[in-house]
Amino acid sequence: MSQRVRRNGSPTPAGSLGGGAVATAGGPGSRLQPMRATVPFQLKQQQQQQHGSPTRSGGGGGGNNNGGCCGGASGPAGGGGGGGPRTASRSTSPTRGGGNAAARTSPTVATQTGASATSTRGTSPTRSAAPGARGSPPRPPPPPPLLGTVSSPSSSPTHLWTGEVSAAPPPARVRHRRRSPEQSRSSPEKRSPSAPVCKAGDKTRQPSSSPSSIIRRTSSLDTLAAPYLAGHWPRDSHGQAAPCMRDKATQTESAWAEEYSEKKKGSHKRSASWGSTDQLKEIAKLRQQLQRSKHSSRHHRDKERQSPFHGNHAAINQCQAPVPKSALIPVIPITKSTGSRFRNSVEGLNQEIEIIIKETGEKEEQLIPQDIPDGHRAPPPLVQRSSSTRSIDTQTPGGADRGSNNSSRSQSVSPTSFLTISNEGSEESPCSADDLLVDPRDKENGNNSPLPKYATSPKPNNSYMFKREPPEGCERVKVFEECSPKQLHEIPAFYCPDKNKVNFIPKSGSAFCLVSILKPLLPTPDLTLKGSGHSLTVTTGMTTTLLQPIAVASLSTNTEQDRVSRGTSTVMPSASLLPPPEPIEEAEG
Protein backbone atom coordinates (compact mmCIF):
# COMPACT_ATOMS: atom_id res chain seq x y z
CA MET A 1 0.00 0.00 0.00
CA SER A 2 1.12 3.48 -0.70
CA GLN A 3 2.07 5.90 1.96
CA ARG A 4 1.60 9.62 2.04
CA VAL A 5 3.63 11.94 4.16
CA ARG A 6 1.53 14.49 6.00
CA ARG A 7 2.39 17.99 6.92
CA ASN A 8 3.79 16.93 10.24
CA GLY A 9 6.03 14.40 8.53
CA SER A 10 4.50 11.23 9.86
CA PRO A 11 3.65 8.51 7.33
CA THR A 12 0.17 7.21 7.28
CA PRO A 13 -0.02 3.57 6.27
CA ALA A 14 -3.24 2.49 4.66
CA GLY A 15 -3.96 -1.18 4.79
CA SER A 16 -6.87 -3.15 3.46
CA LEU A 17 -7.95 -5.53 6.18
CA GLY A 18 -11.09 -7.55 5.85
CA GLY A 19 -12.30 -5.62 2.87
CA GLY A 20 -11.79 -2.27 4.61
CA ALA A 21 -8.91 -0.03 5.46
CA VAL A 22 -8.30 2.16 8.47
CA ALA A 23 -5.87 5.00 8.02
CA THR A 24 -4.42 6.63 11.07
CA ALA A 25 -2.22 9.65 10.88
CA GLY A 26 -0.06 11.47 13.32
CA GLY A 27 3.48 11.73 14.54
CA PRO A 28 4.62 10.70 17.98
CA GLY A 29 5.78 14.14 19.06
CA SER A 30 3.32 16.30 17.19
CA ARG A 31 0.89 17.42 19.90
CA LEU A 32 0.64 21.20 19.85
CA GLN A 33 -2.22 22.19 22.08
CA PRO A 34 -1.88 25.99 21.76
CA MET A 35 -2.74 25.76 18.08
CA ARG A 36 -6.07 24.16 18.78
CA ALA A 37 -8.31 27.19 18.52
CA THR A 38 -6.54 28.84 15.60
CA VAL A 39 -5.96 25.87 13.32
CA PRO A 40 -9.38 25.78 11.63
CA PHE A 41 -9.00 29.36 10.50
CA GLN A 42 -5.29 29.65 9.67
CA LEU A 43 -4.85 26.47 7.70
CA LYS A 44 -8.10 26.54 5.81
CA GLN A 45 -6.55 27.63 2.52
CA GLN A 46 -3.50 25.43 2.96
CA GLN A 47 -5.70 22.38 3.01
CA GLN A 48 -6.70 22.76 -0.59
CA GLN A 49 -3.09 23.13 -1.69
CA GLN A 50 -1.86 20.14 0.25
CA HIS A 51 -4.79 17.98 -0.76
CA GLY A 52 -3.37 17.68 -4.22
CA SER A 53 -3.78 13.94 -4.52
CA PRO A 54 -7.04 12.27 -3.71
CA THR A 55 -7.24 9.52 -1.18
CA ARG A 56 -6.61 6.08 -2.37
CA SER A 57 -9.12 3.34 -2.35
CA GLY A 58 -8.08 -0.16 -1.41
CA GLY A 59 -9.71 -3.40 -2.50
CA GLY A 60 -12.80 -3.89 -0.42
CA GLY A 61 -16.53 -3.76 -0.39
CA GLY A 62 -17.10 -0.65 1.73
CA GLY A 63 -17.55 3.01 0.93
CA ASN A 64 -14.76 5.50 0.37
CA ASN A 65 -13.98 7.53 3.44
CA ASN A 66 -11.88 10.58 2.82
CA GLY A 67 -10.03 12.13 5.70
CA GLY A 68 -10.12 15.88 5.49
CA CYS A 69 -8.55 17.13 8.67
CA CYS A 70 -8.78 20.67 9.84
CA GLY A 71 -5.03 20.99 9.90
CA GLY A 72 -4.76 20.68 6.20
CA ALA A 73 -3.52 17.08 6.04
CA SER A 74 -5.79 14.46 4.57
CA GLY A 75 -5.23 10.97 5.74
CA PRO A 76 -5.84 8.44 2.96
CA ALA A 77 -8.59 6.05 3.71
CA GLY A 78 -8.98 2.77 1.92
CA GLY A 79 -11.97 0.57 1.64
CA GLY A 80 -13.40 1.89 -1.58
CA GLY A 81 -15.07 -1.00 -3.30
CA GLY A 82 -13.45 -1.39 -6.77
CA GLY A 83 -14.18 2.00 -8.29
CA GLY A 84 -15.39 3.86 -5.24
CA PRO A 85 -15.35 7.62 -5.72
CA ARG A 86 -12.08 9.22 -4.78
CA THR A 87 -12.46 12.77 -3.56
CA ALA A 88 -10.06 15.08 -1.82
CA SER A 89 -11.82 16.38 1.24
CA ARG A 90 -11.92 20.09 2.00
CA SER A 91 -13.99 19.95 5.12
CA THR A 92 -12.87 21.71 8.25
CA SER A 93 -15.16 19.92 10.62
CA PRO A 94 -15.12 16.26 11.63
CA THR A 95 -18.18 14.21 11.01
CA ARG A 96 -18.87 10.58 11.37
CA GLY A 97 -17.76 8.05 8.78
CA GLY A 98 -19.96 6.73 6.05
CA GLY A 99 -22.26 3.75 5.84
CA ASN A 100 -22.35 0.99 3.24
CA ALA A 101 -21.18 2.07 -0.22
CA ALA A 102 -21.67 5.76 0.57
CA ALA A 103 -19.04 8.38 -0.16
CA ARG A 104 -17.97 10.29 2.94
CA THR A 105 -15.83 13.35 2.76
CA SER A 106 -15.07 14.01 6.41
CA PRO A 107 -13.00 11.94 8.83
CA THR A 108 -14.17 10.88 12.24
CA VAL A 109 -14.24 7.97 14.49
CA ALA A 110 -16.29 5.84 12.13
CA THR A 111 -17.98 2.56 12.79
CA GLN A 112 -19.08 0.96 9.56
CA THR A 113 -21.19 -2.10 9.07
CA GLY A 114 -19.95 -4.00 6.01
CA ALA A 115 -16.47 -3.23 4.85
CA SER A 116 -15.54 0.38 5.39
CA ALA A 117 -12.67 2.68 6.08
CA THR A 118 -12.23 5.20 8.86
CA SER A 119 -9.58 7.85 8.95
CA THR A 120 -8.68 9.63 12.13
CA ARG A 121 -6.45 12.56 12.76
CA GLY A 122 -3.38 12.52 14.90
CA THR A 123 -2.32 9.68 17.10
CA SER A 124 -5.65 8.69 18.56
CA PRO A 125 -6.68 5.10 17.80
CA THR A 126 -9.46 4.48 15.36
CA ARG A 127 -12.53 2.97 16.89
CA SER A 128 -14.55 0.79 14.60
CA ALA A 129 -17.08 -1.62 15.94
CA ALA A 130 -17.76 -3.17 12.54
CA PRO A 131 -16.67 -6.79 12.13
CA GLY A 132 -15.46 -6.16 8.60
CA ALA A 133 -13.34 -3.10 9.34
CA ARG A 134 -10.62 -3.76 11.86
CA GLY A 135 -8.02 -1.06 12.25
CA SER A 136 -4.48 -1.75 13.35
CA PRO A 137 -2.89 1.42 14.74
CA PRO A 138 0.75 1.98 13.82
CA ARG A 139 1.76 2.21 17.47
CA PRO A 140 0.11 1.38 20.76
CA PRO A 141 -2.64 3.90 21.35
CA PRO A 142 -2.60 6.25 24.31
CA PRO A 143 -5.57 6.09 26.66
CA PRO A 144 -8.38 8.11 25.08
CA PRO A 145 -9.65 11.03 27.14
CA LEU A 146 -13.20 10.78 25.84
CA LEU A 147 -15.40 8.45 23.93
CA GLY A 148 -15.18 10.46 20.75
CA THR A 149 -11.53 11.51 20.86
CA VAL A 150 -10.41 12.87 17.53
CA SER A 151 -6.98 14.40 17.20
CA SER A 152 -6.76 17.87 15.76
CA PRO A 153 -4.76 18.70 12.60
CA SER A 154 -1.82 19.67 14.74
CA SER A 155 -1.98 16.18 16.20
CA SER A 156 -3.48 17.39 19.44
CA PRO A 157 -6.62 15.49 20.43
CA THR A 158 -9.69 17.66 20.46
CA HIS A 159 -12.31 16.24 22.73
CA LEU A 160 -15.56 16.04 20.89
CA TRP A 161 -18.87 15.22 22.44
CA THR A 162 -20.33 11.91 21.53
CA GLY A 163 -23.32 13.65 20.04
CA GLU A 164 -20.92 15.48 17.79
CA VAL A 165 -18.94 12.37 16.95
CA SER A 166 -22.07 10.57 15.97
CA ALA A 167 -23.77 13.50 14.29
CA ALA A 168 -21.89 16.71 13.76
CA PRO A 169 -23.12 19.02 11.02
CA PRO A 170 -20.42 20.59 8.85
CA PRO A 171 -20.17 24.36 8.49
CA ALA A 172 -22.15 26.11 5.84
CA ARG A 173 -19.14 26.98 3.71
CA VAL A 174 -17.97 23.41 3.32
CA ARG A 175 -21.41 21.93 3.00
CA HIS A 176 -21.83 23.14 -0.57
CA ARG A 177 -18.47 21.74 -1.68
CA ARG A 178 -19.22 18.19 -0.74
CA ARG A 179 -20.47 15.53 -3.03
CA SER A 180 -23.21 14.23 -0.72
CA PRO A 181 -24.33 16.94 1.68
CA GLU A 182 -27.52 15.16 2.69
CA GLN A 183 -25.48 12.21 3.88
CA SER A 184 -22.66 14.21 5.39
CA ARG A 185 -25.07 16.25 7.48
CA SER A 186 -26.37 13.54 9.69
CA SER A 187 -28.81 14.83 12.22
CA PRO A 188 -30.04 12.53 15.00
CA GLU A 189 -33.45 12.52 13.37
CA LYS A 190 -32.02 11.20 10.07
CA ARG A 191 -30.08 8.45 11.74
CA SER A 192 -30.68 5.21 9.86
CA PRO A 193 -29.98 1.62 10.91
CA SER A 194 -27.17 1.48 8.34
CA ALA A 195 -25.48 4.43 9.99
CA PRO A 196 -22.13 3.63 11.55
CA VAL A 197 -23.18 4.46 15.08
CA CYS A 198 -25.82 1.78 15.12
CA LYS A 199 -23.24 -0.97 15.49
CA ALA A 200 -21.32 0.81 18.14
CA GLY A 201 -24.46 2.44 19.44
CA ASP A 202 -24.32 0.77 22.81
CA LYS A 203 -21.44 2.97 23.83
CA THR A 204 -22.15 6.07 21.87
CA ARG A 205 -25.90 6.32 21.67
CA GLN A 206 -26.69 6.88 25.31
CA PRO A 207 -24.50 9.93 25.80
CA SER A 208 -25.22 11.21 22.31
CA SER A 209 -28.92 11.41 23.07
CA SER A 210 -28.23 14.13 25.61
CA PRO A 211 -25.28 16.22 24.42
CA SER A 212 -26.28 19.14 26.57
CA SER A 213 -25.78 17.06 29.70
CA ILE A 214 -22.30 16.15 28.51
CA ILE A 215 -21.63 19.78 27.78
CA ARG A 216 -22.50 20.63 31.35
CA ARG A 217 -20.27 17.87 32.65
CA THR A 218 -17.21 19.06 30.73
CA SER A 219 -15.49 21.64 32.83
CA SER A 220 -12.56 22.51 30.56
CA LEU A 221 -12.72 25.20 27.94
CA ASP A 222 -10.74 23.03 25.51
CA THR A 223 -13.65 20.71 25.04
CA LEU A 224 -15.89 23.64 24.22
CA ALA A 225 -13.52 25.72 22.12
CA ALA A 226 -12.62 23.60 19.09
CA PRO A 227 -16.06 22.31 18.05
CA TYR A 228 -17.69 25.55 19.08
CA LEU A 229 -15.41 27.62 16.87
CA ALA A 230 -16.06 25.16 14.06
CA GLY A 231 -19.74 26.02 14.37
CA HIS A 232 -21.09 22.62 15.45
CA TRP A 233 -22.04 22.80 19.01
CA PRO A 234 -24.93 25.30 19.11
CA ARG A 235 -26.68 23.69 16.17
CA ASP A 236 -26.18 20.13 17.35
CA SER A 237 -27.25 20.75 20.91
CA HIS A 238 -30.12 22.99 19.86
CA GLY A 239 -31.80 20.14 18.05
CA GLN A 240 -31.73 18.02 21.18
CA ALA A 241 -32.29 20.65 23.84
CA ALA A 242 -36.06 20.24 23.93
CA PRO A 243 -36.21 16.70 25.40
CA CYS A 244 -33.80 17.72 28.12
CA MET A 245 -36.05 20.60 29.02
CA ARG A 246 -39.03 18.27 29.04
CA ASP A 247 -37.29 15.94 31.43
CA LYS A 248 -36.84 18.80 33.82
CA ALA A 249 -40.39 19.93 33.32
CA THR A 250 -41.59 16.71 34.90
CA GLN A 251 -39.78 17.63 38.08
CA THR A 252 -40.55 21.35 38.15
CA GLU A 253 -43.44 23.61 37.32
CA SER A 254 -44.64 23.68 33.74
CA ALA A 255 -44.58 27.46 33.43
CA TRP A 256 -41.09 27.68 34.86
CA ALA A 257 -39.87 24.92 32.56
CA GLU A 258 -41.34 26.63 29.51
CA GLU A 259 -39.65 29.89 30.35
CA TYR A 260 -36.39 28.09 30.91
CA SER A 261 -36.65 26.22 27.61
CA GLU A 262 -37.38 29.44 25.74
CA LYS A 263 -34.43 31.16 27.34
CA LYS A 264 -32.19 28.20 26.62
CA LYS A 265 -33.21 27.97 22.99
CA GLY A 266 -32.73 31.69 22.56
CA SER A 267 -29.25 31.42 24.02
CA HIS A 268 -28.29 28.64 21.62
CA LYS A 269 -29.53 30.55 18.63
CA ARG A 270 -27.67 33.68 19.55
CA SER A 271 -24.49 32.02 20.75
CA ALA A 272 -23.49 30.80 17.28
CA SER A 273 -21.47 33.99 16.80
CA TRP A 274 -20.16 34.29 20.34
CA GLY A 275 -17.12 32.92 22.05
CA SER A 276 -17.02 30.00 24.44
CA THR A 277 -16.48 32.24 27.46
CA ASP A 278 -19.61 34.21 26.62
CA GLN A 279 -21.46 30.93 26.31
CA LEU A 280 -20.37 29.81 29.74
CA LYS A 281 -21.25 33.18 31.22
CA GLU A 282 -24.71 33.02 29.74
CA ILE A 283 -25.24 29.52 31.06
CA ALA A 284 -24.24 30.70 34.51
CA LYS A 285 -26.68 33.61 34.24
CA LEU A 286 -29.46 31.28 33.23
CA ARG A 287 -28.78 29.04 36.19
CA GLN A 288 -28.85 32.00 38.53
CA GLN A 289 -32.13 33.18 37.07
CA LEU A 290 -33.58 29.72 37.46
CA GLN A 291 -32.54 29.56 41.07
CA ARG A 292 -34.04 32.99 41.68
CA SER A 293 -37.25 31.97 40.00
CA LYS A 294 -37.39 28.83 42.14
CA HIS A 295 -36.91 30.79 45.33
CA SER A 296 -39.39 33.45 44.30
CA SER A 297 -42.01 30.91 43.30
CA ARG A 298 -41.59 29.05 46.57
CA HIS A 299 -41.71 32.31 48.48
CA HIS A 300 -44.95 33.33 46.77
CA ARG A 301 -46.40 29.91 47.45
CA ASP A 302 -45.57 30.21 51.10
CA LYS A 303 -47.14 33.65 51.22
CA GLU A 304 -50.29 32.48 49.50
CA ARG A 305 -50.55 29.57 51.87
CA GLN A 306 -49.97 31.70 54.92
CA SER A 307 -51.95 34.83 54.12
CA PRO A 308 -55.55 33.60 53.82
CA PHE A 309 -55.64 30.38 55.79
CA HIS A 310 -52.77 29.99 58.24
CA GLY A 311 -53.55 33.35 59.78
CA ASN A 312 -57.15 32.28 60.30
CA HIS A 313 -56.22 29.07 62.04
CA ALA A 314 -53.83 30.91 64.28
CA ALA A 315 -56.51 33.44 65.11
CA ILE A 316 -59.04 30.72 65.87
CA ASN A 317 -56.58 28.92 68.09
CA GLN A 318 -55.83 32.11 69.98
CA CYS A 319 -59.47 32.98 70.49
CA GLN A 320 -60.76 29.58 71.55
CA ALA A 321 -59.89 30.14 75.18
CA PRO A 322 -61.08 33.71 75.95
CA VAL A 323 -63.77 34.18 73.28
CA PRO A 324 -67.01 32.14 73.18
CA LYS A 325 -68.00 30.11 70.13
CA SER A 326 -70.41 32.76 68.97
CA ALA A 327 -67.45 35.02 68.29
CA LEU A 328 -65.60 32.29 66.41
CA ILE A 329 -68.41 31.74 63.93
CA PRO A 330 -68.04 35.01 62.00
CA VAL A 331 -64.27 34.59 61.71
CA ILE A 332 -64.47 32.16 58.79
CA PRO A 333 -66.50 34.38 56.44
CA ILE A 334 -64.46 37.40 57.44
CA THR A 335 -61.32 36.29 55.69
CA LYS A 336 -63.20 35.42 52.52
CA SER A 337 -64.54 38.94 52.09
CA THR A 338 -61.68 40.96 53.51
CA GLY A 339 -58.91 38.76 52.17
CA SER A 340 -60.22 38.86 48.63
CA ARG A 341 -61.19 42.52 48.39
CA PHE A 342 -59.01 44.30 50.91
CA ARG A 343 -55.86 42.23 50.90
CA ASN A 344 -53.84 45.30 49.93
CA SER A 345 -55.41 47.61 52.52
CA VAL A 346 -53.66 46.13 55.52
CA GLU A 347 -52.57 49.47 56.93
CA GLY A 348 -56.04 50.95 56.79
CA LEU A 349 -57.48 47.95 58.57
CA ASN A 350 -54.91 48.24 61.31
CA GLN A 351 -55.66 51.94 61.81
CA GLU A 352 -59.38 51.47 62.13
CA ILE A 353 -59.03 48.49 64.41
CA GLU A 354 -56.70 50.43 66.65
CA ILE A 355 -59.41 53.09 67.03
CA ILE A 356 -61.97 50.47 68.00
CA ILE A 357 -59.61 48.85 70.46
CA LYS A 358 -58.88 52.17 72.14
CA GLU A 359 -62.58 52.58 72.73
CA THR A 360 -63.04 49.12 74.22
CA GLY A 361 -60.03 48.72 76.47
CA GLU A 362 -56.27 48.42 76.88
CA LYS A 363 -56.07 44.65 77.10
CA GLU A 364 -56.30 44.20 73.38
CA GLU A 365 -53.85 47.02 72.71
CA GLN A 366 -51.23 44.93 74.44
CA LEU A 367 -51.98 42.04 72.10
CA ILE A 368 -51.58 44.07 68.89
CA PRO A 369 -47.76 44.32 68.66
CA GLN A 370 -47.44 40.54 68.95
CA ASP A 371 -48.89 39.93 65.48
CA ILE A 372 -47.86 43.15 63.74
CA PRO A 373 -44.30 42.07 62.77
CA ASP A 374 -45.72 39.36 60.53
CA GLY A 375 -47.52 41.59 58.06
CA HIS A 376 -49.48 38.88 56.32
CA ARG A 377 -50.82 37.23 59.45
CA ALA A 378 -51.57 40.41 61.36
CA PRO A 379 -54.92 41.49 59.83
CA PRO A 380 -57.04 38.35 60.50
CA PRO A 381 -56.43 38.21 64.28
CA LEU A 382 -57.00 41.95 64.53
CA VAL A 383 -60.28 41.56 62.68
CA GLN A 384 -61.28 38.88 65.10
CA ARG A 385 -60.43 41.11 68.03
CA SER A 386 -62.79 43.63 66.55
CA SER A 387 -65.38 40.86 66.35
CA SER A 388 -64.82 40.06 70.01
CA THR A 389 -65.43 43.72 70.81
CA ARG A 390 -68.57 43.50 68.72
CA SER A 391 -69.77 40.58 70.78
CA ILE A 392 -69.38 42.85 73.81
CA ASP A 393 -71.38 45.52 72.00
CA THR A 394 -74.20 43.10 71.33
CA GLN A 395 -74.49 42.42 75.06
CA THR A 396 -74.10 46.03 76.17
CA PRO A 397 -74.99 48.38 73.30
CA GLY A 398 -74.03 52.03 73.76
CA GLY A 399 -74.35 55.23 71.77
CA ALA A 400 -70.71 55.43 70.77
CA ASP A 401 -70.61 51.72 70.04
CA ARG A 402 -73.65 52.05 67.84
CA GLY A 403 -71.90 54.83 65.99
CA SER A 404 -68.89 52.63 65.30
CA ASN A 405 -71.15 49.78 64.28
CA ASN A 406 -73.12 52.06 62.00
CA SER A 407 -69.97 53.13 60.24
CA SER A 408 -68.97 49.54 59.65
CA ARG A 409 -72.41 48.42 58.55
CA SER A 410 -72.90 51.26 56.11
CA GLN A 411 -70.07 49.99 53.97
CA SER A 412 -71.25 46.45 53.23
CA VAL A 413 -73.05 45.56 50.02
CA SER A 414 -76.64 44.29 50.16
CA PRO A 415 -79.52 45.59 48.03
CA THR A 416 -82.13 43.95 50.27
CA SER A 417 -80.83 45.92 53.23
CA PHE A 418 -81.11 49.03 51.08
CA LEU A 419 -84.84 48.38 50.83
CA THR A 420 -85.13 47.81 54.54
CA ILE A 421 -83.45 51.14 55.14
CA SER A 422 -86.16 53.08 53.39
CA ASN A 423 -88.93 51.16 55.17
CA GLU A 424 -87.55 51.12 58.69
CA GLY A 425 -86.30 54.67 58.50
CA SER A 426 -89.88 55.92 58.51
CA GLU A 427 -90.96 53.47 61.21
CA GLU A 428 -88.24 54.06 63.77
CA SER A 429 -87.50 57.74 63.80
CA PRO A 430 -85.02 57.90 66.74
CA CYS A 431 -82.73 55.28 65.25
CA SER A 432 -82.76 56.99 61.89
CA ALA A 433 -82.00 60.31 63.56
CA ASP A 434 -79.10 58.70 65.37
CA ASP A 435 -77.90 57.24 62.12
CA LEU A 436 -78.13 60.61 60.40
CA LEU A 437 -76.06 62.12 63.15
CA VAL A 438 -73.49 59.38 63.09
CA ASP A 439 -73.15 58.76 59.35
CA PRO A 440 -70.98 61.74 58.31
CA ARG A 441 -68.47 60.73 60.94
CA ASP A 442 -68.75 57.16 59.83
CA LYS A 443 -68.17 58.10 56.22
CA GLU A 444 -64.99 59.88 57.11
CA ASN A 445 -63.81 56.94 59.15
CA GLY A 446 -65.23 54.34 56.85
CA ASN A 447 -63.46 55.52 53.72
CA ASN A 448 -60.17 54.69 55.36
CA SER A 449 -61.10 51.07 56.11
CA PRO A 450 -64.39 49.63 54.84
CA LEU A 451 -66.15 46.29 55.29
CA PRO A 452 -64.34 44.42 58.06
CA LYS A 453 -66.39 46.03 60.84
CA TYR A 454 -69.64 44.89 59.37
CA ALA A 455 -68.36 41.54 58.23
CA THR A 456 -67.16 40.56 61.68
CA SER A 457 -70.39 41.07 63.65
CA PRO A 458 -73.73 40.07 62.12
CA LYS A 459 -75.82 40.82 65.29
CA PRO A 460 -79.17 39.40 64.10
CA ASN A 461 -80.95 40.23 67.38
CA ASN A 462 -80.80 44.02 66.96
CA SER A 463 -83.11 45.36 64.26
CA TYR A 464 -81.21 48.60 63.64
CA MET A 465 -78.34 46.62 62.13
CA PHE A 466 -80.34 46.16 58.94
CA LYS A 467 -80.57 49.89 58.52
CA ARG A 468 -76.81 50.05 58.28
CA GLU A 469 -76.55 48.05 55.05
CA PRO A 470 -76.50 50.45 52.08
CA PRO A 471 -74.53 49.80 48.90
CA GLU A 472 -70.78 50.30 48.73
CA GLY A 473 -71.13 54.03 48.07
CA CYS A 474 -72.15 54.61 51.70
CA GLU A 475 -74.97 56.83 50.50
CA ARG A 476 -77.52 55.79 53.10
CA VAL A 477 -77.91 59.31 54.48
CA LYS A 478 -78.59 60.66 51.01
CA VAL A 479 -81.30 58.06 50.56
CA PHE A 480 -83.25 59.41 53.56
CA GLU A 481 -82.72 62.97 52.40
CA GLU A 482 -83.89 62.20 48.89
CA CYS A 483 -86.94 60.14 49.84
CA SER A 484 -88.67 62.74 52.03
CA PRO A 485 -88.21 65.82 49.82
CA LYS A 486 -89.14 63.94 46.68
CA GLN A 487 -92.46 62.98 48.23
CA LEU A 488 -93.10 66.64 49.15
CA HIS A 489 -91.62 68.70 46.35
CA GLU A 490 -90.59 66.58 43.40
CA ILE A 491 -93.85 64.67 43.08
CA PRO A 492 -95.85 67.88 42.50
CA ALA A 493 -93.03 68.90 40.22
CA PHE A 494 -93.80 65.82 38.13
CA TYR A 495 -97.46 66.79 37.98
CA CYS A 496 -96.76 70.43 37.22
CA PRO A 497 -95.40 69.91 33.71
CA ASP A 498 -98.35 67.64 32.97
CA LYS A 499 -100.79 70.35 34.17
CA ASN A 500 -98.96 72.93 32.17
CA LYS A 501 -99.28 70.78 29.10
CA VAL A 502 -103.02 70.36 29.69
CA ASN A 503 -103.49 74.09 30.25
CA PHE A 504 -101.16 74.89 27.41
CA ILE A 505 -103.23 73.07 24.80
CA PRO A 506 -106.16 75.54 24.55
CA LYS A 507 -103.92 78.58 24.86
CA SER A 508 -101.10 77.83 22.46
CA GLY A 509 -101.36 77.37 18.70
CA SER A 510 -100.04 73.81 18.51
CA ALA A 511 -101.63 70.91 16.64
CA PHE A 512 -102.68 69.21 19.86
CA CYS A 513 -105.24 71.89 20.72
CA LEU A 514 -107.10 71.10 17.49
CA VAL A 515 -107.29 67.48 18.53
CA SER A 516 -108.55 68.27 22.01
CA ILE A 517 -111.04 71.03 21.16
CA LEU A 518 -112.45 70.35 17.67
CA LYS A 519 -115.80 71.89 18.66
CA PRO A 520 -115.40 75.22 16.87
CA LEU A 521 -113.57 74.83 13.58
CA LEU A 522 -112.89 78.54 13.32
CA PRO A 523 -109.70 78.36 15.43
CA THR A 524 -108.15 75.93 12.98
CA PRO A 525 -107.51 78.50 10.22
CA ASP A 526 -106.57 80.99 12.90
CA LEU A 527 -104.01 78.59 14.21
CA THR A 528 -102.72 77.90 10.76
CA LEU A 529 -102.48 81.59 10.00
CA LYS A 530 -100.75 82.21 13.30
CA GLY A 531 -98.39 79.40 12.57
CA SER A 532 -97.88 80.61 9.02
CA GLY A 533 -95.66 83.35 10.35
CA HIS A 534 -93.25 80.68 11.44
CA SER A 535 -93.89 77.68 9.19
CA LEU A 536 -97.00 77.51 7.01
CA THR A 537 -96.45 74.22 5.29
CA VAL A 538 -95.78 72.16 8.34
CA THR A 539 -98.66 73.51 10.41
CA THR A 540 -101.28 73.15 7.72
CA GLY A 541 -100.17 69.71 6.78
CA MET A 542 -99.88 68.59 10.37
CA THR A 543 -103.32 69.91 11.22
CA THR A 544 -104.97 68.04 8.37
CA THR A 545 -103.07 64.86 8.98
CA LEU A 546 -103.57 64.92 12.73
CA LEU A 547 -107.27 65.66 12.47
CA GLN A 548 -107.97 62.56 10.44
CA PRO A 549 -106.65 59.82 12.77
CA ILE A 550 -107.29 61.47 16.11
CA ALA A 551 -110.85 62.56 15.38
CA VAL A 552 -111.68 58.93 14.65
CA ALA A 553 -110.86 58.04 18.21
CA SER A 554 -112.64 61.01 19.83
CA LEU A 555 -115.77 61.75 17.77
CA SER A 556 -118.27 59.90 15.59
CA THR A 557 -117.54 59.19 11.95
CA ASN A 558 -120.24 61.50 10.57
CA THR A 559 -119.09 64.58 12.41
CA GLU A 560 -115.52 63.65 11.53
CA GLN A 561 -116.12 63.63 7.81
CA ASP A 562 -118.03 66.89 7.88
CA ARG A 563 -115.49 68.73 9.99
CA VAL A 564 -112.54 67.33 8.16
CA SER A 565 -114.05 68.35 4.84
CA ARG A 566 -114.81 71.78 6.23
CA GLY A 567 -111.36 72.04 7.69
CA THR A 568 -109.78 71.23 4.36
CA SER A 569 -112.09 73.66 2.55
CA THR A 570 -111.31 76.44 5.01
CA VAL A 571 -107.64 75.80 4.90
CA MET A 572 -107.47 75.67 1.13
CA PRO A 573 -108.49 79.29 0.40
CA SER A 574 -106.62 80.68 3.37
CA ALA A 575 -103.43 78.89 2.53
CA SER A 576 -103.50 77.25 -0.87
CA LEU A 577 -100.24 75.48 -0.24
CA LEU A 578 -101.47 71.96 0.52
CA PRO A 579 -99.83 70.32 -2.51
CA PRO A 580 -96.36 71.69 -1.69
CA PRO A 581 -96.52 70.95 2.05
CA GLU A 582 -97.20 67.28 1.48
CA PRO A 583 -93.81 66.60 -0.17
CA ILE A 584 -92.20 68.87 2.38
CA GLU A 585 -93.72 66.78 5.12
CA GLU A 586 -92.38 63.67 3.46
CA ALA A 587 -88.95 65.20 3.20
CA GLU A 588 -89.05 66.32 6.79
CA GLY A 589 -90.68 63.11 7.98
UniProtKB/Swiss-Prot annotation:
Residues 384-397 have a biased composition (Polar residues). Residues 45-56, 108-136, 147-158, 207-220, 404-417 have a biased composition (Low complexity). The modification Phosphoserine is found at residues 10, 106, 210, 219-220, 273, 345, 391, 449, 457. The gene is FAM117B. InterPro entries: Glcci1/FAM117. The keyword Phosphoprotein applies. It comes from Homo sapiens. ALS2CR13 is mapped in the genomic region covering the complete candidate region for Amyotrophic lateral sclerosis 2 (ALS2). Keywords: Phosphoprotein. Residues 292-302 have a biased composition (Basic residues). Pfam families: FAM117 (PF15388). This is Protein FAM117B. Residues 1-310, 370-464, 556-589 are annotated as: Disordered. Residues 16-29, 57-85 have a biased composition (Gly residues).
